Every structure is written in structure tokens, then in C-alpha cells.
A protein has these predicted regions:
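Helix-coil boundary and interhelical linker segments in multi-pass alpha-helical membrane proteins
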Residues: 25-47, 88, 94-113, 193-207, ...
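Topogenic membrane-insertion module of multi-pass membrane proteins
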Residues: 1-61, 218-258
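Lipid-exposed faces of alpha-helical membrane segments in multi-pass integral membrane proteins
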Residues: 11, 15-21, 49-52, 88-91, ...
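Transmembrane alpha-helical segments that form the membrane-embedded catalytic/substrate-channel core
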Residues: 57, 116-129, 213-226
């Protein structure tokens, strides 16, 4: 059946699809007025969707790499679908949340579009870097193979083969740093920003707008930031979720106005 469909349909992209669905659900919750739901849940639920998207993005690559023998097209598809999903989850969703909380004037609309454009630019450039990285790795592997073939002592020293092969191991080529702020970081940035909402009241929109602008600029400014692995990223997202959930609970108990 899957051979009759375009795309990849196996567990390697399942988490990416799950995160994408969460992002779409968050957008819908933010846009739809439900008369049976308290107003504050119209952005609290989308924020939890945003954090769930962050968790999915943390693990999608880990899960994908568990499948051995993936073709180049499968790997490329995974990379492309991840970026497209990130645009929805970490580009469009935060902007829609901003629209929901009141950033609806023409000036604010320009800001929301600016934020989405910066996210789009960053993700497109990331894809360019990944393609360049793949080409460089292929050239290095070809050069390494040529060196092995030209080495007269290769058969007498099998350890040399292992050492040469290790130099092109993709796991050794994984990036350790990003240039600019990764879009996935908004999974914890904006929920933390929302922690100030009960205390700022009608002025919170200005804080959220400022956060959108600063984060958007950081998407494209060239500075080095360490890449967090799953073990490092998950505690950060969970901690932010707990802080946000605790504040929501506290606001309900104290009847703080959101």
C-alpha cells in the first residue's frame, strides 16, 4: 500500500507527524471561539500544544535514526518534513497565539508577519546548510575510499580500514552548534513569557510583541548556540511545562484574571 503513495509512511516520521498535528490543533484552538470554554483556555491549550510540539521535535530524529538502512531519499524526506512541520508549529502557531491575545491592529499584523518570515528564513537556511553538509560528507567519504584503495598496506593493517571508516561516520558529523536561535526553542520561550500575563493584565500584549520581535531577530542573527541533545532538552521543556501548569493552577485558585 505505501508503495502506491508518495512520501514516507513508517515509524521514522510518526513523531514528526504527531508534532505537526499538535501544531494544527493549537492553531485551531487559538482561532475558534468556543462558547462552552473559558476565554483563557483559548491560549492556554495552544501553549500546551506548542510545548508538546517541542517534545516531539526533540525525539523525532532520535527515533528516525533507530531504523537501519534508510535510503537517502528517506533521510531527505525526514529532514524536509521536519522543517515544514517546524514552520507550522514554531512559526505560525506563536503568531496565531499573538493574534488571539489582541495583536490585531495593522502594526501588530506586520510584526506577526515579520516573525513568521524570520522563522521561514531560518528554516530554509538550515536546509541549505544540511544539503551542503551532506555533499561535504559524500566528498569526504569518496576521498577516504580513494585513500584506502591507494594504500598498499591496507590488507596488512585492517585497523586502518576501521579508522578510516570512522572518519566518515555520520554520527561523528552531527552538528554541535547552531548559528542563530533554533526555532524549536520557542517551545519553552513563549510559555515562560506567558507566566507574566496574570500580573501584567492588558499590558501583556506589549511584552508578547517584544518577545516576538526579539526572537524573530535572533532567528537570523549569526551567533553560535550549543545544540542540546534529547537528554538536555527534555528536562528544560518539562520544567517549563510544570512552571506554566503550576501558574495556571495558581491563577485558578487565586482567581487571577488572564
Amino acid at each position: 500500500m505505501k508503495n502506491k503513495l508518495i512520501g514516507v509512511w513508517d515509524y521514522t516520521v510518526l513523531i514528526t507527524y504527531l508534532g505537526f498535528c499538535s501544531g494544527i490543533a493549537g492553531i485551531i484552538f487559538a482561532l475558534v471561539n468556543n462558547p462552552h470554554t473559558n476565554e483563557k483556555w483559548s491560549f492556554i491549550i495552544p501553549l500546551f500544544c506548542l510545548m508538546f510540539c517541542g517534545l516531539c521535535d526533540t525525539f523525532d530524529g532520535v527515533v528516525a535514526r533507530t531504523k537501519k538502512g534508510r535510503t537517502k531519499n528517506e533521510k531527505r524526506f525526514g529532514s524536509q518534513i521536519d522543517s515544514l512541520s517546524d514552520m507550522v508549529c514554531f512559526g505560525v502557531l506563536p503568531a496565531v497565539i499573538g493574534f488571539r491575545i489582541g495583536l490585531k491592529q495593522p502594526t501588530w499584523i506586520i510584526l506577526l508577519v515579520f516573525y513568521c518570515l524570520m522563522a521561514l528564513t531560518r528554516l530554509a537556511w538550515f536546509n541549505v546548510e544540511e544539503i551542503e553538509k551532506e555533499v561535504n560528507e559524500a566528498l569526504a567519504a569518496a576521498e577516504n575510499q580513494k585513500s584506502r584503495n591507494d594504500n598498499e598496506n591496507l590488507e596488512e593493517n585492517p585497523a586502518l580500514t576501521e579508522e578510516a571508516a570512522a572518519t566518515v561516520d555520520p554520527r561523528e558529523k552531527r552538528r554541535k552548534f547552531y548559528h542563530g536561535l533554533p526555532v524549536t526553542n520557542v517551545a519553552w520561550i513563549f510559555p515562560l513569557v506567558f507566566c507574566f500575563k496574570p500580573f501584567l493584565g492588558v499590558y501583556f500584549g506589549f511584552l508578547y510583541a517584544a518577545a516576538l520581535f526579539v526572537v524573530g531577530v535572533l532567528f537570523v542573527v549569526k551567533f553560535k548556540i550549543k545544540k542540546l541533545n534529547a537528554k538536555q532538552a527534555v528536562p528544560v521543556i518539562i520544567l517549563c511545562a510544570l512552571i506554566f501548569a503550576g501558574l495556571v493552577t495558581l491563577s485558578v485558585v487565586l482567581q487571577l484574571k488572564w
